[in-house]
Amino acid sequence: MEKLNNFDNFVNKNFKISIAFFALGLFFGIVYSINLLGFSLNSETLNPANMRAIHISLMLYGFIPLMLSYLPFLLINKEVGFDKEGLRYLNLYTIFWYIFLVFMVVSLLLGKNRGLAFYDFAYELNFLLALAGVFYIIALYKFIRLYKRFLYG
């Protein structure tokens, strides 16, 4: 893991990575739209139900939620700075979130499809989300502790 000593670099790096997931979701949305217009791709993997599930799931779990989850950290960083240990946990949260997104896309493309519009990925992937959530809570705790140091010296 690279040295994380600058919060701005962390956010910029992850913004660029997250844009790739946004573009992927947009791609699957366009493929689904083309299917709705009547141009059919004769593929078992790229069928309309899979495309819809991937597009909606990437919009619900991809770029926007991940960037919004950084908002408390951005506000704390603006007021009192950042905690290196908290940034390390935030990085772990982000890594597990990316792993979840990759497995979710693969699961929706190649796995059994129940025909749901979203949340059609394997339930076992919820473990990755829960683990990411633990790291998020720890990172938030480390960042919030900065207020105590800032206010009381």
Identify the function of each model-found stretch.
Residues M1-G153:
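Hydrophobic alpha-helical transmembrane segments of multi-pass integral membrane proteins
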